[in-house]
Curated annotation (Swiss-Prot):
The keyword ATP-binding does not apply. Part of the 30S ribosomal subunit. Forms a tight complex with proteins S10 and S14. Residues 39-107 form the KH type-2 domain. Belongs to the universal ribosomal protein uS3 family. This is Small ribosomal subunit protein uS3. It comes from Nitrosomonas eutropha (strain DSM 101675 / C91 / Nm57).
Amino acid sequence: MGQKINPTGFRLSVLKNWSSRWYANTKKFSVFLNEDINVRQYLQKRLAHASVGSIIIERPSRNAKITIHTSRPGVVIGKKGEDIEILRKNVEKLMNVPVHINIEEIRKPEIDAQLIAASITQQLEKRIMFRRAMKRAIQNAMRLGAQGIKIMSSGRLNGIEIARTEWYREGRVPLHTLRAEVDYGTSEAKTTYGVIGVKVWVFKGEQLSVRDRQN
């Protein structure tokens, strides 16, 4: 089961937490879910060059709190906070409630799975050889403390006629162990030959469960 399932979904309530944290009744649920999808799409498009790893959406009573995890907080905030204020006003229009935006810096982007996947796809779009991009990402991750990393690229790699899948792996990546902190990220490179999909698994070590850490 651990081989096929999304590693983040598999560990929800054990090690991982939800990226949307709110409760709604039956009528409001679809409305809130649609708003969350629109907000995420807007932020990912607007902050495409800001190295955003994850977006957390919380909804306390009649307002919203959005936490953006990024390795380049200065790009998100902008000069004297101008960019983040524009961002906040646009998100408020999408959600129809007062919004507070919080920025958290990713200290080690080299071991963040989503940022690794995004970096590889950017290199593929610039026509850098996929093997070089994948090997460089693995070396950087292992150098900065990852205990294991696995990368998969799938599509018309280097413009070949028949699409294929390539894997690179170093260290240990336990997919079945629930207490193993496995970070997972995906991205797509849109090249002249078609779309190339990239998946990244990063093993950062074994952790206590969320419940044990709270007790």
